[in-house]
């Protein structure tokens, strides 16, 4: 199989490199999406012995309103058949429930807003999958369709941002160690998304026009509020302004996140002007959602944050202040900051300029240029 788009964007490898790659077995995680499909093809073109693996991480109910695992598996199988590679199948639903989903629920109960995709990468894709591929399938490497790159300095692997700035997924992979990065290949991290689609169309792959998945992996396209209500009982309460004025009611604190504007159900409040309301605090003790008016309200701003559950890609704790940039949510512009270590497990992060909607439970991920240093979970804001 050939792709002119591939040949345009990937220079041919030397005979020596091809010969070396042919000795290596790569298990490519096949999600049934276009990124993993093209990743498998790129690896084939680079000479590797490629096999696919489809992971089922969630036991579904009877809801058929979103893209099911069965449909994704069919797409993954169709791509593997087209490429002429074997597809393995594995069920990690028990591991997912124990190591990802239960933590997700606990965080929501505690009033925080977790990011299960980060935990899924840590516990499933780069732990359970990596271990299974190496130990049971004899893999030299695993590969995924993530938009990140591998770098190397002084013989140590580094995690780099994906070439496509709009699709870079290093934010979700900051928990990887340098050793996990060394065992992983990220073929589409070297190109931009439109090129990935063009390669898939050149090859006539079943996933060429399949839209990108959105939402949390185990919820799919369903309404988040309806899904969460099945597992956590909601506790309705008051919505108050910072000054204490009652302006509405909420269905449950867990349905709201800091900085949220839409979906609060607050109409025009007499004597309070037309500026929209934003969530600035979740008062768990009193079950009150605290709001303030105006996107530039000082109550929305933080001068920094405290983070814990730290993961550094090189696995070396930070002992001295470090200048870098940080993202406190995906696709955010880089924020210049200084990391100030409190101890090996906790850091203070001071922003150069105040930032809005710094959300406990989300991750703060740090960069120096293209290099992802690692990150941690936001514990509190610093006002």
Swiss-Prot record:
UniProt region (Interaction with target base in tRNA), positions on chain: 115-117
Region (Interaction with tRNA) residue spans: 167-169, 329-330
One Gene Ontology molecular-function label: ATP binding
Catalyzed reaction equations: S-sulfanyl-L-cysteinyl-[protein] + uridine(34) in tRNA + AH2 + ATP = 2-thiouridine(34) in tRNA + L-cysteinyl-[protein] + A + AMP + diphosphate + H(+)
Disulfide bond residue pairs: 120-217
A GO CC term assigned to this protein in UniProt: cytoplasm
Pfam families linked: tRNA_Me_trans, tRNA_Me_trans_C, tRNA_Me_trans_M
UniProt-annotated binding residues for ATP: 29-36, 55, 145
Active site positions: 120 (nucleophile), 217 (cysteine persulfide intermediate)
NCBIfam families, alphabetized: PRK00143.1, trmU
Keywords linked to the UniProt accession: ATP-binding, Cytoplasm, Disulfide bond, Nucleotide-binding, RNA-binding, Transferase, tRNA processing, tRNA-binding
Annotated protein name in UniProt: tRNA-specific 2-thiouridylase MnmA
Family statement: Belongs to the MnmA/TRMU family.
Site feature Interaction with tRNA, where: 146, 362
tRNA processing is among the record's keywords: yes
InterPro entries documented for this protein: MnmA-like, MnmA-like_C, MnmA-like_central, MnmA-like_central_sf, Rossmann-like_a/b/a_fold
HAMAP family reported for this sequence: tRNA_thiouridyl_MnmA (MF_00144)
Species per Swiss-Prot/TrEMBL record: Pasteurella multocida (strain Pm70)
BP terms from Gene Ontology: tRNA wobble position uridine thiolation
Keyword field contains Isomerase: no
Subcellular location: Cytoplasm
